[in-house]
Amino acid sequence: MQKDYETFVEKLEIGIYEATGIPRENISFEKEGGRFAPVGDRLLVKFAEHDDAWEVCGLYTQELFKSYQNGSPFEKIIKEITDDLNRIKKADIYEKTRVIRDYEKTKPRLFIRLLNADKYSADLQDAVYKTLGDIALVLYMKVTEYEGCVTSTKIRQGMLEQWGKECDEVFKEAILNTYFMSPPRIYRWEQMIFNPEYEGESFMNLGDKCELKKDAMGNCLSTTKKTNGAVAVFLPGVAEQLAYLLDSDFYMVFTSVHEVMIHNDKFVEPEDLQCVLRDTIREATPKEDYLTSRIYQYNRETHKFICVTPLEEDEK
């Protein structure tokens, strides 16, 4: 199996070179655990060089190999890769990131994403972020958005110094931007399964009629865009409103970076939730979408988030 995988990766390198003309020396493989491959093997394709930077596209080779094993033709995989590279080139991302030096132009584009602080520790060394347990709230700038797909870049510590801004001030702007870029929504599983047009339920505005489940089943929280929607629980006023609607403190179960289950803490134990989360991660959460296997709680009296379960044995 390993030899088949290695042969596939080598074939990918050759296929990309032949389809795009990108020199082989600009295509490199990095094993999981490297700085640019924290959650999975990646093929790094340098497709454009500038005076002060390279533009690089990272391909998750294990996912591509799985698709190949499941019957996807190799030619189709190469076509999808070249289409993505062409789309990225046309987006002119490098030029659009140059505004990053101007804080006033960058400010409306700032937003927050969640990452696992341990798995991404190498890449977070000079990033701007805050932590809660093993969750990192990371500062990003939106570069482009095409057909619902957002291209973004992390803000590095050096930019705060160049802007002359404190971390707390910039974070406050980014959290607020994140709310308006993709407002929070409650999603009903039965609606998601049977109604393709379902867009979730608003619960933050006066007049919203959204009743939360107060039993052990819990409520699925995400955002209108769903992608990276687990951040919703940390957006302004959201935790307070959830606690008000539940009339209770609540536990948070982050099934992926895209959503978080909200559970009334009167009817379920965190240890039981952690067992369910462990199974969900193993059976349904792609490696690159993993956030945490720990359970968190919101206290409505203190307005604080805390971690209430220890690390799993395989994380220590």
Task: Outline where the language-model segments fall.
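Hydrophobic, Leu/Ile/Phe/Ala-enriched alpha-helical segments that form helix-helix packing faces
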Residues: 12-21, 81, 85, 89, ...
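Generic alpha-helical structural element
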Residues: 1, 5, 159-163, 231, ...
